[in-house]
From Swiss-Prot:
Protein's name according to its UniProt entry: A-type ATP synthase subunit B
Record's GO cellular component terms: plasma membrane; proton-transporting two-sector ATPase complex, catalytic domain
Subunit structure: Has multiple subunits with at least A(3), B(3), C, D, E, F, H, I and proteolipid K(x).
Protein origin, superkingdom: Archaea
Record carries keyword Acyltransferase: no
Function summary: Component of the A-type ATP synthase that produces ATP from ADP in the presence of a proton gradient across the membrane. The B chain is a regulatory subunit.
The species this protein was found in: Sulfurisphaera tokodaii (strain DSM 16993 / JCM 10545 / NBRC 100140 / 7)
MF annotations from Gene Ontology: ATP binding; proton-transporting ATP synthase activity, rotational mechanism; proton-transporting ATPase activity, rotational mechanism
Localisation: Cell membrane
Disulfide bonds, paired cysteine numbers: none
Length: 465
């Protein structure tokens, strides 16, 4: 940083929430890093978020409590926020400013990078085609995640999204390249007990060695919450495109991120958009989600799994609605399955992976994968219709085939969707379980599966020549 770029002012005209207004600044840049020196000599940092008519608004990371409009100095540093990043960060826990939260030493090696990153040139993007095994049957079998994809999880209040996120972080891998796989885990505005759960889970399972955690708590200033996914993705980009690693970025909870955006927008007295959220929330979310992907000529990749809580389980709420426009599908957690004691309570009919078709099949997962998933979807959808009919006319009035569909639905939920927190299923195991639950139905009902796959994988024929 050149000292020639540093400008110092002392005329703070307003302090409101996490913002301060500085008069007389004519050349401030958006997202420029600012240093505030208090009368007692202590310092805080912030970013320029707006500048108009000679007044510049600065968002203070540590909050504005204790800042005095008289006696405080505001320095504009002529650069964006940079964080030192390195491979040393794997196995460690940091705040979004890159400062350790695990009582370990600061990062010594590595390099400083602007947390806003550089957008991937669309012409250099490579289409996702490699399967990532999460060990979760409802994802791997029916809504497969591909390397370079962005696939969010839509949860509801009280549903086990945290447990599922931790399990995926522990189990996910690109088969054959396990040693070259890393997880960047951003916990945004979580409660202290949730942050402690993630830390203990990763440490006790040994997954911490390949995980870099970035954490902000619920009582942290909104400006820090907004920085969390950006810093995490800056490390992900470094590991993927400089160190040729396959990186899975898990961002939880993006609802807290959007609430922080709304809080800052209200502090700036901006005209609210839909649901009271700022009108630029779609663009802001896109700057985060679009940092996932593969680049032609680079061995590494960034795969994203943003996780968000739907207020009132409403998928039409602005946060899940806008997220769905940007990402490539969604995994939806269902309260009725959760109330049945099924974990993970993934509603496969509401879930979708738009890129799945390009990452499954012979040479990628197994030759029967596509046919089997189509049949499981169709059979479960029909079973749900039959459940509704049975609730009206009673099971005794159903045909024999319809009653078998009811048995199939129960087995599908209890044996295919449900699995243990520490149960890591290979894709072969997942597909075999799918065949086992389908074997409840008459063979004549398996109209979406080619006969050669039935002869090869159906339990009635498996192992026979």
């Amino acid at each position: 940083m050149s000292l020639l770029n540093v400008r110092e002012y002392s005329n703070i005209s307003m302090i409101k929430g996490p913002l301060i207004a500085v008069q007389g600044v004519s050349d401030a840049a958006y997202n420029e890093l600012v240093e505030i020196e208090m009368p007692d000599g202590s310092k805080r940092r912030g970013l320029v978020v707006d500048s108009q008519m000679g007044v510049t608004f600065v968002q203070v990371f540590e909050g504005t409590t204790g800042i005095s409009p008289t006696g405080s100095k505001v320095r504009f540093l002529g650069r964006g926020l940079e964080v030192k990043i390195s491979e040393e960060m794997l196995g460690r826990i940091f705040n979004p400013l890159g400062e350790p939260l695990d009582n370990g030493p600061p990062v010594i090696g590595g390099e400083k990078r602007n947390i806003n990153g550089d957008p991937i040139n669309p012409a250099t993007r490579e289409y996702p085609e490699e399967f990532i095994q999460t060990g979760i049957s409802a994802i791997d079998g029916l809504n497969s995640l591909l390397r370079g994809q962005k696939l969010p999880i839509f949860s509801g209040s009280g549903l086990p999204a945290n447990t599922l996120a931790a399990q995926i972080a522990k189990q996910a891998t690109v088969r054959g390249e396990e040693s070259n796989f890393a997880v960047v885990f951003a916990a945004i505005g979580v409660r202290y007990d949730e942050a402690l759960f993630f830390r203990k889970f990763f440490e006790e399972t040994g997954a911490i060695n390949r995980v870099a955690m970035f954490v902000t708590l619920a009582n942290d200033p909104p400006s820090l919450k907004i920085l969390t996914p950006k810093t995490a993705l800056t490390l992900a980009e470094y590991l993927a495109f400089e160190k040729d690693m396959h990186v899975l970025a898990i961002l939880i909870d993006m609802t807290n991120y959007c609430e922080a955006l709304r809080e800052l927008s209200a502090s700036r007295e901006e005209v609210p958009g839909r649901g009271g959220y700022p009108g630029y929330m779609y663009t802001d979310l896109a700057t985060i989600y679009e940092r996932a992907g593969k680049v032609i000529g680079k061995k590494g990749s960034i795969t994203q799994m943003p996780i968000l809580t739907m207020p009132n389980d409403d998928m039409t709420h602005p946060i899940p609605d806008l997220t769905g426009y940007i990402t490539e599908g969604q995994i939806v957690l269902d309260r009725s399955l959760f109330n049945k004691g099924i974990y993970p309570p993934i509603n496969v009919l509401m879930s979708l992976s738009r890129l799945m078709k390009d990452g499954i099949g012979e040479g990628k997962t197994r030759d029967d994968h596509k046919d089997l998933s189509n049949q499981l979807f169709a059979a479960y959808a029909r079973a749900q219709d039959i459940r509704g009919l049975a609730a009206i006319i009673g099971e005794d009035s159903l045909s024999e085939v319809d009653r078998k569909y009811l048995l199939f639905a129960e087995a599908f939920e209890r044996r295919f969707v449900a699995q243990g927190v520490n149960e890591n299923r290979s894709i072969e195991t997942t597909l075999d379980i799918g065949w086992e639950v389908l074997s409840i139905l008459p063979e004549s009902e398996l109209s979406l599966i080619r006969s050669e796959y039935i002869k090869k994988y159906h339990p009635n024929y498996r192992g026979k020549k």
